[in-house]
């Protein structure tokens, strides 16, 4: 079962809806803001079918405003996706992602859905977001990644998962970097030998295939795969960038003259 949330309130930086209000406003009773958002209840309870009816059934009274209702923000810039994350409703996140919402949107202080799920210890929601390719390197106003927020709130399982996701991303990015470097050499003055080029591209393909077939690989295994690829490509690129020692015409002539003199003396 997932954690019930941060051990402390994020009051002034994340979860407070009265952030930076003056004393007079804080003392006032909250005003009625209109009818309750019809998406809220199904989002919090995991009623995916109910949400789909609103988004996909033209006869539903809220159909035309569905996206607007979903993206309505509170005072700190959170929409209903954040509520779903806090509630640990992973299936809701997956379902709503199909409607083209931006899963990397930030609050006024730079928190993403991933930061939110990490703070609340919603491991399954973190997994869903990572599967949906959210930016795991996004920073909040404290320059914290989601992993750092999870650590701050002692969400150990979330920290471990995000470390694993980071190791996987590191390998993916290195493969992409190497592949791009091969393409760039074709445009520049220093070109790879055909054999070397094929060796590198073949190694990159092999590592991508390994990633696809080893979805549960450990952090150590991911690091090992990167090291193996690095051991293949580094000597090749080093060889390509090392200048050849070509003899100048003057040195060749001088060498030939010396050799001729030696032959004469003999």
UniProtKB/Swiss-Prot annotation:
<dbReference type="GO" id="GO:0008283">
    <property type="term" value="P:cell population proliferation"/>
</dbReference>
<feature type="compositionally biased region" description="Acidic residues">
    <location>
        <begin position="18"/>
        <end position="32"/>
    </location>
</feature>
<feature type="region of interest" description="Disordered">
    <location>
        <begin position="1"/>
        <end position="43"/>
    </location>
</feature>
<dbReference type="GO" id="GO:0005737">
    <property type="term" value="C:cytoplasm"/>
</dbReference>
<dbReference type="InterPro" id="IPR050776">
    <property type="entry name" value="Ank_Repeat/CDKN_Inhibitor"/>
</dbReference>
<feature type="compositionally biased region" description="Acidic residues">
    <location>
        <begin position="1"/>
        <end position="11"/>
    </location>
</feature>
<dbReference type="GO" id="GO:0030496">
    <property type="term" value="C:midbody"/>
</dbReference>
<keyword id="KW-0963">Cytoplasm</keyword>
<dbReference type="GO" id="GO:0005886">
    <property type="term" value="C:plasma membrane"/>
</dbReference>
<dbReference type="InterPro" id="IPR036770">
    <property type="entry name" value="Ankyrin_rpt-contain_sf"/>
</dbReference>
<keyword id="KW-0677">Repeat</keyword>
<dbReference type="GO" id="GO:0090543">
    <property type="term" value="C:Flemming body"/>
</dbReference>
<dbReference type="InterPro" id="IPR029048">
    <property type="entry name" value="HSP70_C_sf"/>
</dbReference>
<dbReference type="Pfam" id="PF12796">
    <property type="entry name" value="Ank_2"/>
</dbReference>
<protein>
    <recommendedName>
        <fullName>Ankyrin repeat domain-containing protein 45</fullName>
    </recommendedName>
</protein>
<dbReference type="GO" id="GO:0005813">
    <property type="term" value="C:centrosome"/>
</dbReference>
<comment type="function">
    <text>May play a role during cell division.</text>
</comment>
<feature type="repeat" description="ANK 2">
    <location>
        <begin position="109"/>
        <end position="138"/>
    </location>
</feature>
<dbReference type="GO" id="GO:0032154">
    <property type="term" value="C:cleavage furrow"/>
</dbReference>
<dbReference type="InterPro" id="IPR002110">
    <property type="entry name" value="Ankyrin_rpt"/>
</dbReference>
<keyword id="KW-0040">ANK repeat</keyword>
<dbReference type="GO" id="GO:0005829">
    <property type="term" value="C:cytosol"/>
</dbReference>
<feature type="repeat" description="ANK 1">
    <location>
        <begin position="76"/>
        <end position="105"/>
    </location>
</feature>
């Amino acid at each position: 079962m997932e954690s019930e949330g941060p051990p402390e309130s994020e009051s002034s930086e994340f979860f407070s809806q009265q952030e930076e209000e003056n004393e007079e406003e804080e003392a006032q009773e909250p005003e009625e803001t209109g009818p309750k958002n019809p998406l809220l209840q199904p989002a919090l309870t995991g009623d995916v079918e109910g949400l789909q009816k609103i988004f996909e059934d033209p006869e539903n009274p809220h159909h035309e405003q569905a996206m607007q209702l979903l993206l309505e923000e509170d005072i700190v810039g959170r929409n209903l996706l954040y509520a779903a994350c806090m509630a640990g409703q992973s299936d809701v996140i997956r379902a709503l992602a199909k409607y083209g919402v931006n899963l990397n949107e930030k609050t006024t202080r730079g928190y993403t859905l991933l930061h939110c799920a990490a703070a609340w210890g919603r491991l399954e929601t973190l997994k869903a977001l990572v599967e949906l390719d959210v930016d795991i390197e996004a920073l909040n106003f404290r320059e914290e990644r989601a992993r750092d927020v999870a650590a701050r709130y002692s969400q150990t399982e979330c920290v471990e998962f995000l470390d694993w996701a980071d190791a996987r991303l590191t390998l993916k990015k290195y493969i992409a970097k190497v592949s791009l470097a091969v393409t760039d050499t074709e445009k520049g003055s220093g070109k790879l030998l055909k054999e070397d080029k094929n060796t590198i591209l073949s190694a990159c393909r092999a590592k991508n295939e390994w990633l696809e077939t080893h979805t549960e690989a450990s952090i150590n295994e991911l690091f090992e795969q990167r090291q193996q690829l690095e051991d293949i490509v580094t000597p090749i690129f080093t060889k390509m960038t090392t200048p050849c020692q070509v003899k100048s015409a003057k040195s060749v002539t001088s060498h030939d003259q010396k050799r001729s003199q030696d032959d004469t003396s003999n």
